[in-house]
């Protein structure tokens, strides 16, 4: 890039970086190596001697691990020596190197090209290990008495290390042969799914060091056994934006599914569940305590872990400590809730909006195209045994008639939303603007039977069943079918295919679990066609589809 008037060239930081030989880092017992790697760059870490773990999952000796776009820490209980070197530059799916992705992230000048890296002697790992041992004692008691195992709720502000603690407790549980159910209630980040997902997964095997939680089922080799998540879709970033009408009912359905699994699976019943929550619930905003209480009640929580907030800890102590749980067996066993305060790790760093956007894009790309990080673990499964082999998936592209789809959108107005943006799905409360339509909100009679492709789900409309309870439940759900023509803003967004029928009531669509996701690559409103990517081939199932317009929002550049 030339500088105007000076006739000089400015060399990019990526070009200035010269790959240095690997660096050896020695850690004393009870210390950890904290590092940050930008998206688009990668480092390689190898355990040369001793023992080490990343968020509770042990690193194998002499095995090279690749990390990109992450902020993490490698801890050692007894001391170890690590070898850290630079990895390959990773290109995005659209073919552009991500050195300038999301604000111009470039390779740093730390070991291996880390943006930041240092060794820390003070860590809260002893506290976290003590929590694991306490939970293990509760599991042994549950096995002896036939009661349910511990149901753990993790609370804390943003960037306090809640998800890291959930990974540590899960890894330690699986290490001793337990099978915990992990529940993610944070729509900002996906767990084994895309952002906007609320998921529950039973972990029977170890987690993937490079990919965090691991990977969901895919048609390709995997060094770590894949996980089978149960997924629900909440297409909003903030659980308080539609807490009463959308978020809490989905949490109830998820809790019901988890409870049913624990009733049928003795191993998961004894091990219990670990619930990760969004940080906004800990900020004291209106409605947050109601959502926390709903989670505590629905999952029959008996252990609340609070990280990094004295105020929240005090509130939880007053509200729940030593109070009876909501478990069905609580009355007979006199089970009580325990509130525990934990220290926030000094390695927790703030993740800005640009980094979180890159995280969301990476999760969505991985869902459709596989893991872009070159991994020697996946290379070991390849016949070529190439050190740069990575798991690449090929999504199926197809063109669909928009009229053949039942696409629904949540009609919730956000404070920072542009109300002038044209979107046919936001016009009116009925189908007045559709040719031949009429405004059902002004009529007392039910919807005509010939319009079977549309189910009344807007506030104030009477359901075809005529039952007051069902009608009231459906009218409370801010879910409306997107009318034709296909809105152009549908492009570059996600569609969630539910298990609900296309004409199911709005409450049933909201509460339905997800089959999979589509990515809308292009929209032709004149022809009524949309071009989508699907993880598998074949026809799109005739099911109700929920549009992730507000969250995870627009994802540009996924395809060329």
Swiss-Prot record:
ATP binds at residues 32, 71, 159-164. Residues 416-479 are annotated as: Disordered. InterPro entries: Clp1, Clp1/Grc3, Clp1_C, Clp1_C_sf, Clp1_N, Clp1_N_sf, CLP1_P, P-loop_NTPase. GO terms for molecular function: ATP binding; polynucleotide 5'-hydroxyl-kinase activity. GO terms for cellular component: mRNA cleavage factor complex. Pfam families: Clp1, CLP1_N, CLP1_P. GO terms for biological process: mRNA 3'-end processing; tRNA splicing, via endonucleolytic cleavage and ligation. Coiled coil: none annotated. It is found in: Nucleus. Keywords: ATP-binding, mRNA processing, Nucleotide-binding, Nucleus. Required for endonucleolytic cleavage during polyadenylation-dependent pre-mRNA 3'-end formation. Belongs to the Clp1 family. Clp1 subfamily. Component of a pre-mRNA cleavage factor complex. Interacts directly with PCF11. This is mRNA cleavage and polyadenylation factor clp1. It comes from Aspergillus clavatus (strain ATCC 1007 / CBS 513.65 / DSM 816 / NCTC 3887 / NRRL 1 / QM 1276 / 107). The lineage of its organism: Eukaryota, Fungi, Dikarya, Ascomycota, Pezizomycotina.
């Amino acid at each position: 890039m030339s500088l105007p008037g000076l006739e000089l060239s400015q060399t990019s930081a990526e070009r200035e970086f010269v790959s240095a030989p690997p660096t050896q880092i020695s850690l004393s017992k009870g210390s950890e190596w904290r590092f940050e790697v930008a998206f688009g760059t990668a480092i390689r870490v190898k355990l040369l001697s001793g023992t080490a773990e990343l968020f509770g999952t042990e690193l194998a000796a002499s095995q090279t691990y690749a990390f990109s776009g992450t902020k993490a820490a490698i801890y050692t209980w007894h001391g170890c020596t690590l070898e850290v070197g630079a990895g390959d530059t990773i290109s995005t799916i659209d073919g552009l190197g991500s050195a300038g992705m999301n604000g111009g992230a470039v390779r740093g000048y730390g070991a291996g090209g880390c943006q930041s890296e240092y060794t820390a002697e003070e860590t809260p790992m002893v506290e976290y290990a003590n929590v694991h041992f306490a939970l293990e004692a509760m599991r042994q008691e549950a096995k002896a008495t036939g009661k349910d195992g511990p149901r753990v709720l993790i609370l804390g502000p943003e960037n306090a290390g809640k998800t890291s603690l959930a990974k540590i407790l899960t890894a330690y549980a699986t290490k001793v042969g337990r099978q915990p159910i992990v529940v993610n209630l944070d729509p900002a980040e996906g767990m084994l799914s895309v952002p906007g997902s609320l998921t529950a997964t039973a972990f029977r095997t170890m987690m993937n060091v490079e990919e965090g939680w691991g990977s969901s089922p895919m048609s390709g080799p995997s060094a770590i056994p894949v996980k089978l998540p149960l997924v629900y879709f909440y297409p909003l970033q903030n659980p308080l934006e539609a807490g009463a009408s959308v978020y809490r009912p989905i949490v109830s359905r998820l809790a019901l599914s988890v409870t049913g699994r624990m009733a049928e699976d003795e191993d998961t019943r004894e091990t219990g569940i670990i619930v990760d929550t969004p940080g906004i619930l800990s900020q004291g905003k209106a409605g947050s305590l109601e959502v926390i209480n709903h989670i505590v009640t629905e999952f029959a929580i008996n252990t609340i872990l609070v990280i990094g907030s004295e105020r929240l800890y005090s509130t939880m102590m007053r509200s729940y400590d030593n109070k009876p749980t909501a478990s069905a067996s609580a009355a007979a066993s006199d089970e009580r809730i325990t509130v525990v305060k934990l220290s926030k790790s000094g390695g927790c760093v703030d993740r800005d909006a640009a980094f979180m956007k890159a995280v969301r894009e990476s999760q969505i790309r991985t869902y459709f195209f596989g893991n872009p990080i070159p991994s020697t673990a996946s290379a070991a499964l390849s016949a070529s045994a190439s050190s740069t082999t990575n798991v690449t998936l090929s999504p199926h592209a197809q063109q669909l008639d928009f009229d053949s789809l039942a696409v629904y959108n949540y009609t919730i107005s956000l404070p920072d939303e542009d109300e002038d943006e044209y979107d046919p799905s936001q016009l009116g409360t009925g189908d007045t603007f559709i040719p031949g339509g009429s405004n059902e909100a002004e009529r007392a009679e039910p919807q005509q039977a010939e319009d079977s492709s549309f189910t009344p789900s807007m506030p104030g409309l009477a359901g075809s069943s005529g039952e007051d309870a069902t009608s009231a439940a459906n009218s409370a759900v801010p879910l409306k079918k997107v009318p034709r023509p296909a809105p152009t803003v549908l492009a570059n967004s996600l569609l969630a295919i539910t298990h609900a029928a296309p004409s199911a009531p709005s409450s049933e669509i909201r509460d339905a679990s997800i089959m999979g996701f589509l990515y809308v690559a292009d929209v032709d409103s004149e022809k009524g066609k949309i071009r989508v990517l699907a993880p598998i081939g074949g026809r799109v199932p005739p099911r109700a589809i929920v549009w992730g317009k507000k969250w995870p929002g627009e994802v540009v550049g996924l395809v060329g």
